[in-house]
Structure formats: C-alpha cells, structure tokens
A protein has these predicted regions:
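Juxtamembrane intracellular "pre-TM" segments in multi-pass secondary transporters
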Residues: 1-15, 194-226, 411-413
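Helix-loop boundary and gating motifs at the non-cytosolic
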Residues: 5-61, 222-261
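Helix-to-loop junctions at the C-terminal end of transmembrane segments
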Residues: 67-80, 167, 272-285, 371
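C-terminal ends and interior cores of transmembrane alpha-helices
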Residues: 90-104, 295-307
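Cytoplasmic helix-loop-helix junction between adjacent transmembrane helices
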Residues: 117-151
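Intracellular juxtamembrane helix-capping segments at the cytosolic ends
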Residues: 123-136, 326-340
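Symmetry-related core transmembrane helices of the 12-TM Major Facilitator Superfamily/SLC fold
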Residues: 174-191, 380-395
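C-terminal transmembrane helical hairpin of 12-TM major facilitator-type secondary transporters
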Residues: 286-328
Length: 413
C-alpha cells in the first residue's frame, strides 16, 4: 500500500514540500542529536558537577528566550529557506566552538557555545512554524507536524547511538561528524530552490521588547493552557537531554542495553507520527494532548521504582510513546491559532518558541540540582509526579475553545 501511495505523495505539492523540509531538518538535527548526547557528558566531566552542567546548558535557552523576543521584530521579509540557512550557519559556529572547548574546556567557552546553540535552535523553530502555517492547509496541520516529527525523532533516535560510537574514537570526532552532516543539509537546502521561498509578511521597523512582552501577555491570557502544557513537555525533554544523557551513559557501563535508555526516549515518535498523521485530528486536540501527557507522567514517575535495566527501558518507552502523541497535537493547536492571526502571527510563534526556551532555562538546572541530591534515576520520578499534577489541573480547567481578542490584535503594529 505504501509503495503504491508514495509516488502520489511525491507528486502532491503540499506533501512534497513537507518531505523536502523534513529531509533537510533530518540531517541538521542528526548533527544536533549527536552533539546533544555528547555535550552534557563532556561538560559534566569537565566541570565535575551535574548542577553546573545544568546551569551551563540552561544558558543556551536564556539566549534563546531573548531571541524569541527579538526575532519577531527583525524577521521582516525572511523566507523559510533563509531562516534554515541562518540556522545551518549557526550550527557550523557551534560545532567549531565545541572543537575549541576540547582543547580548552573553560566555562566561558562553554557559555559562548551555548549562546550560539540557543540562537541556532530558535532560527530552526521559527522556520518550521512559518512553514506549517503557510504551506499546509488547516486540516493538515497536525498531520504535517506528525510527519515532520518522524524525521526529527529518527535523528534524535540515531544521534545518541552514533554519538556513543564516535565518542569511542576520540573527543573531537562527534563535532567533526556533526559538521559533515550539517554541510549535507546545506547542500539539500540549496537544491530546494523553489519550495520554500515565501517570505514572512510582516511590517515592523523597530525592536521593542516591552511591546512584544505586552503582546505575549495578551496572548497568554487566552491560550494559557497550551502554553503551560508546552512548558512542562519541554521540562521532560530537557531532563532527558541533560540528566538523561548522563543516566544513559551510566546504564551503558552496566550493559550495552543500558545505552538504549536515551534512544528509546526518542524512538516512539518514529511510529507515533504516522498514527497522528493518519488520525488527522481536527477537534479536541487540547484535551487529548493533556490526557496523553497525564499518563506519560505516571510512567515517567515509575522510573524511580527500580534501577533494573529492563524496567528502565520499558517505562521510558511507554512514557515516551504517550508523550510523543502530545507533541504534534500541541503543535497542531499552535498552528491552528497562528493561521487565524494573519500578519500578527509572528507574536504567537515567538510565544510558542519561548515555552521551549523557558523549559530549557528551568529544566537542566532543576534536573541537575535534583540529580546532585537524590541521583539521576529519582530525578525522573520527581519530574513525572510534577507532570501528573499539572496535567490533571489542566484537564479540569482548560476551556473548550481558545478565543483570541481579534479586535485588539488588529490594532497591533
């Protein structure tokens, strides 16, 4: 069935664009995933502190949060292609700084690398949001995010595995390989000449952070359930890619299977993305995402019950499978609202991107602090219990429809 359907998909203009961007992002994010596995272990070994490691990685999101405020004001006329290109250039700089850090592992160099990392990630995020909102019809927003999440999840599944193999060949090898993959992504982007040329149609001539924060305040008062849910999903993700990377390495010292802890966190999105795309959920995305997040938190908390590798892998796989459904559903809600906002959509894109930055500002330092007191394994229990409580409250309080103040939005300049 898939063999017969695939040629028709390639001929479809919308899905052709989705698959093209997905392949480009796969190469870029595979490079990022390799570095994301290596960097927490490298920083923690260099600084000899899980808490300091968390603080350093949190700095990337402090910069990313600032980018969320500034980018909507300065991206006038930028195409998706140009945003991705700038992200690729930032990735090259990030890898180069990390190469320098292997020779001089000083705190200031780590902070500089994290600053570039924060900018790079936000550029890619703005590009993705703009692409889905403009290049796919409303009814396919969740499906588009589901398919793109497959490419993302494949990259982050393979990244830790490849990163572990590369690290065995030397400290610099992961960075060299990441540069090669990023270059391949650049080649694919240059070949996609006609697919991502539509510019962001905004008309802003100055950077006004106070005004942007005021816009966010207005939007938050109307879309707060989805913002809060995004933050806590981001906290889970931040925990896995900091404390989880260290815990995965610790388990791998006991057994080869232990090294699959972090890859199994990313694996479910490979097949869950197909399921979400097939559902084509049009209504009820918010509450459905909250329900899946609730049960994901339960299994995440169960990681603290035992350190047996079999149960560690089982619980993380089930928890991640449930969480993997929530992500594209939540992104679909954002895309629905973005499509209703007209030329002022950039403000909601900035707000949605800021939730990830906030999660990664709080998450690594919070997880690192907990890990320094009760250990990596129990850190997941603490995060899981928090997620269960928050998602339960959201299920009880989320309104059926998120309404925007359209008249007020029309007055924004």
């Amino acid at each position: 069935m898939f063999v017969k359907t695939f040629p028709r998909i390639l001929k479809d203009e919308v899905w052709s664009k989705v698959l093209t961007l997905g392949m480009i992002l796969f190469l870029i994010l595979l490079a990022d995933a390799i570095l994301s596995f290596w960097v927490p272990n490298f920083i923690q070994d260099s600084l000899q502190s899980s808490f300091l490691m968390g603080l350093v990685i949190s700095f990337s999101s402090v910069v990313g949060f600032g980018a969320d405020l500034i980018f909507p004001q300065i991206l006038r006329g930028f195409t998706v292609k140009r945003l991705i290109l700038l992200g690729i250039l930032s990735s090259f700089i990030f890898s180069a700084i990390l190469l320098g850090a292997t020779a001089a592992p000083y705190l200031v160099i780590f902070l500089l690398a994290m600053a570039v990392w924060g900018i790079y990630y936000e550029l890619l995020g703005f590009g993705e949001q703009q692409f889905v909102a403009d290049s796919t019809p409303l009814r396919l927003h969740s499906a588009a995010w589901g398919v793109m999440s497959i490419f993302r999840s494949l990259a982050y599944f393979l990244g830790p595995i490849i990163g572990g193999l590369l690290l065995a060949r030397g400290d610099r090898t992961p960075a060299y390989f990441a540069i090669l993959l990023t270059f391949l992504g650049l080649v694919f982007l240059m070949l996609a000449r006609e697919k991502h040329k539509r510019p962001i149609e905004i008309d802003v001539h100055e950077v006004n952070l106070i005004r942007e924060l005021a816009h966010w305040k207005v939007l938050f008062s109307h879309v707060w359930p989805i913002v809060i849910m995004s933050i806590f999903m981001g906290l889970v993700d931040a925990t896995f890619w900091t404390t989880g990377a260290v815990w995965s390495h610790t388990l791998s010292e006991r057994s080869w299977w232990g090294g699959m802890f972090l890859p199994l966190y990313t694996l479910p999105s490979l097949f869950v993305g197909f399921v979400v795309a097939k559902w084509q959920v049009f209504e009820g995305k918010k509450r459905l995402a909250e329900k899946f997040l609730f049960f994901s938190g339960i299994f995440l908390a169960m990681l603290g019950l035992t350190d047996a590798i079999f149960f560690q892998l089982l619980f993380v796989f089930v928890s991640s499978t449930l969480l993997a459904v929530s992500f594209p559903l939540t992104d679909g809600v954002y895309s629905d609202i973005v499509a209703r906002m007209g030329r002022e959509r950039r403000h909601l894109i900035g707000l949605s991107r800021s939730t990830i930055s906030i999660a990664y500002i709080i998450g690594p330092a919070w997880a690192g602090f907990i890990a320094s007191t009760i250990g990596e394994r129990l850190t997941f229990s603490a995060v899981g219990i928090t997620v269960v409580v928050v998602s339960a409250v959201l299920l009880l309080t989320t309104p059926k429809k998120l309404k925007l103040p359209q008249e007020e939005i029309k007055k924004w300049e």
